[in-house]
Amino acid sequence: MPVEKFLKDFTIPEKIEFLKSQDDGSYGKFTIYPFERGFGVTIGNTLRRVLLSSIEGYAITAMRIQSNNKDSSSKVVSSEFDLIPGVSEDTLEVIANIKNIHLKLGEGEQRKIISFSVSGKDTKVLKASHFERDGVEVFNRDLVIATLSQDVNLDLEFQINYGRGYVSSEQNSKYLEEVNVIALDSIFSPIEKVSYSVEDTRVGQRSDYDKLVMEIWTTGVISAKDAIKKAASIIREFLFPLIDFEDNINTSFEKSKSESSNLLDMSIEKLDLSVRSLNCLAKENVRTLGELISKNAEELSKARNFGKKSLEEIIEKLSSYQLFLGMSKEDALFVLSKNVKISE
């Protein structure tokens, strides 16, 4: 029996209902139905595993702490087992608190280093809100990081990265060049919890169809609604190669990859940017789409006469094509090969 004819006998989900959420979008409850018997568990379990393992996010991957005391003595914390003078908590507890900060960088940013100082005289308690600077957004601002004595001043430096899943401190340490910088193990996932259940639902005279009920809790870095969309997209990308085993799928991919490479050589004038933005980019010798995405937001912001509005315009224009600043050429080619069209 041909596959196409066989699939006509399947009942495909027609309704996706967003039942409830929190105001910040960090919680969502969804129902998807009707499924043929057994497909509710299959789809629910797959979505749950992908949500918990594969949604990208941000985490602090390294830190440097220097304690300066009233008697002019100073100490750089050299390891997680070292003490921080003037801080009530031990270093392991401080690190545990730091790893619980839920934060996010600006659009398209994948790495940032932030530095700041706090004085025990002015700040008795160091909180996650102190990390909210230089475009960093914090979602649990009231989280306590450390308690400071009155005569201590701390110079702090933290590295924030974009990633997926769990990365050990040993892996993060490979990318550190400075001494007295402590690498942290990092959990990038913005998903806190996922649960699902399957209920019976009726279609016509039959009541043996599946209704999938999913609940998603996030840190706030991504909304529950966007998280389930992203998980479904990831599953689709993994299953796409299985749809057609013919050799022409490889030929088609190579053709689309070649066309995508040509698009990276396209003039930025075809992006319909404002004259001001185009002039600023021209002064930085950015003339093609490929040259534009190779720049990160920080580089462009430092350009002369390059304002916030121009940066926002460029980020918005690139995002409409699923591209972003600081994107690698390989990632851009992959995205463009998925039939993302840019008008000539």
UniProtKB/Swiss-Prot annotation:
Write out the GO cellular component annotations: cytoplasm; DNA-directed RNA polymerase complex
- Region described as Alpha C-terminal domain (alpha-CTD): spans on this chain: 259-344
Reaction(s) catalysed (UniProt annotation): RNA(n) + a ribonucleoside 5'-triphosphate = RNA(n+1) + diphosphate
Any GO BP annotation: DNA-templated transcription
Keyword annotations for this protein, in alphabetical order, are:
DNA-directed RNA polymerase, Nucleotidyltransferase, Transcription, Transferase
User: Its Enzyme Commission number?
Assistant: 2.7.7.6
Q: Which GO terms describe its molecular function?
A: DNA binding; DNA-directed RNA polymerase activity; protein dimerization activity
Query: InterPro entries, from UniProt?
Result: DNA-dir_RNA_pol_insert, DNA-dir_RNA_pol_RpoA/D/Rpb3, DNA-dir_RpoA, RBP11-like, RNAP_asu_C, RNApol_insert_sf
Region Alpha N-terminal domain (alpha-NTD), annotated ranges: 1-246
- Indicate whether Nucleotidyltransferase appears among the record's keywords: yes
Quaternary structure and interacting proteins, as annotated? Homodimer. The RNAP catalytic core consists of 2 alpha, 1 beta, 1 beta' and 1 omega subunit. When a sigma factor is associated with the core the holoenzyme is formed, which can initiate transcription.
UniProt lists the family membership as follows: Belongs to the RNA polymerase alpha chain family.
**Record's domain comment?**
The N-terminal domain is essential for RNAP assembly and basal transcription, whereas the C-terminal domain is involved in interaction with transcriptional regulators and with upstream promoter elements.
- Describe its function: DNA-dependent RNA polymerase catalyzes the transcription of DNA into RNA using the four ribonucleoside triphosphates as substrates.
Identify this protein by name. Answer: DNA-directed RNA polymerase subunit alpha
| Organism listed in the record | Borrelia garinii subsp. bavariensis (strain ATCC BAA-2496 / DSM 23469 / PBi) (Borreliella bavariensis)
* Gene designation per UniProt: rpoA
